[in-house]
């Protein structure tokens, strides 16, 4: 996979703790995250697959891969964005996610869009 300036995807993430869906007594902490994928390049591109690395506060790592996101493989023209919200369940009050998307430009060129690490944290627990 190659990366070049014409194929530039920006990814922004926000996360929040879902207290009502969590059960602290059972060590079940539910988080939602919203992703904004923006095509900052000058060629249309389609999101083909996702690759996540999810790490809890104990260092337990889970890898998740799959086609597209939320059942879609969105195609973004230059200047377009796609937003979606998904969720994750951790066994600890804090954790982290990071990963990348496999992308394909209209000309068939494959490239990677990086998802920088972001924090998952129950409010008032981050030190």
Curated annotation (Swiss-Prot):
InterPro entries assigned to the protein according to its UniProt record, in alphabetical order: ApaG_domain, ApaG_sf, Uncharacterised_ApaG
Pfam families listed in its UniProt record: DUF525 (PF04379)
Gene3D superfamilies hit by this protein: ApaG domain
Coiled-coil blocks: none
Residues covered by the ApaG domain: 3-127
Listed GO biological process terms: error-free translesion synthesis
Classification via HAMAP family: ApaG
Protein name (record): Protein ApaG
Organism, scientific name: Xylella fastidiosa (strain Temecula1 / ATCC 700964)
Gene: apaG
